[in-house]
Each structure stands twice: as structure tokens, then as C-alpha cells.
Amino acid sequence: MQNKTNNNWPSYYLYYILMLVFFGVFILYYKHDVGNDSTISDWLINYSGGFVRRGLIGQLAIEFSNFFSFKLRDSILMFQIFFFTIYYFFVFFILRKVIENRLIILSIFSPIFILYPIAEIEAFGRKEILIFLIIVSYFLVNIQN
């Protein structure tokens, strides 16, 4: 019985990550229509007033919006969904590699790591996901080597 449960862990992780992505996309879509969402303004920092650090993503969102004739809020929503989804699938690939380490599994499933953006709506959709994406990418590369 124990062996069968261990073989199913990757599928459990995948279902868990897919649920998080589904709920995350739903929350992001709901938040992007609200007029007073402060996370949108963080993504809008750009280079139109001169060189500003942290302005690259905002400039890319504006250019993306102009090129494809999207509303700016919609292009930022697409960026948020893209980075959010990539982040969680990288976490899934890491989870597949650390099945045996129970301490890592416990820390990953703690509410402060994976569930935090969904549990705390005000923190959801912020640009910090890019930093987390870089960290998770680093771990993913190190685990595969």
C-alpha cells in the first residue's frame, strides 16, 4: 500500500497545482476588473518618464498592449497569468523531484509558500512573483543537474 501511494504523489501534486492555477486565474480575472486594485499600478511602472528601475515589465506591457491593440489592463492580466502559471508549474517540476524528502514537502505545502498568494488576496498579482520565479528556476536547474 505504501508503494502505491508513493507512486501517485506526482499526480496528486499535479492536481493540486492545477487547482491552484485555476483558482489563481479566476481571482486574477476578478481583480483586474476592479478599479482600485493596487497591484495593477505596480505593473505599470515604465520608461516613459525616463529611465526608472523596475520599469522594464511596465514598458513591455505597454508595448504589448499597443502592438496587439489590447486594453492595458488586459495585457497586464495576461502577463500576470503567464508568470503565475509558469511559477506554479516550475514548483510542480521541483515537487516531482523531492518526493522522498518529507520536510521539504511539509514546508512547500505550508500556507506561507504555495497558498500564500491565493490566501492573501492583496499580495496576489504583484511583481514579486518574478523574484519567486527566478528562485524556483534556480532550484529547478540545480535539482536537474
Question: Where are the model-predicted features located?
Answer:
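Start-transfer (signal-anchor) and selected internal transmembrane alpha helices
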Residues: M1-F23, I99-I104
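Extracytoplasmic catalytic/substrate-binding loops of multi-pass membrane glycan-assembly enzymes
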Residues: F26-S41, S48-L60
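Short hydrophobic/aromatic helix or loop-helix immediately within or flanking a transmembrane segment
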Residues: S48-F82
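Aromatic- and kink-enriched transmembrane "portal" helix at the membrane-lumen/periplasm boundary
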Residues: G55, L106-L133
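Transmembrane-helix motifs of polytopic, lipid-linked glycan transferases
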Residues: M78-E100, V136-L140
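Transmembrane-helix signature of polytopic, membrane-embedded enzymes
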Residues: F92-I114
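Specific aromatic-rich, kink-prone transmembrane helix
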Residues: I129-Q144
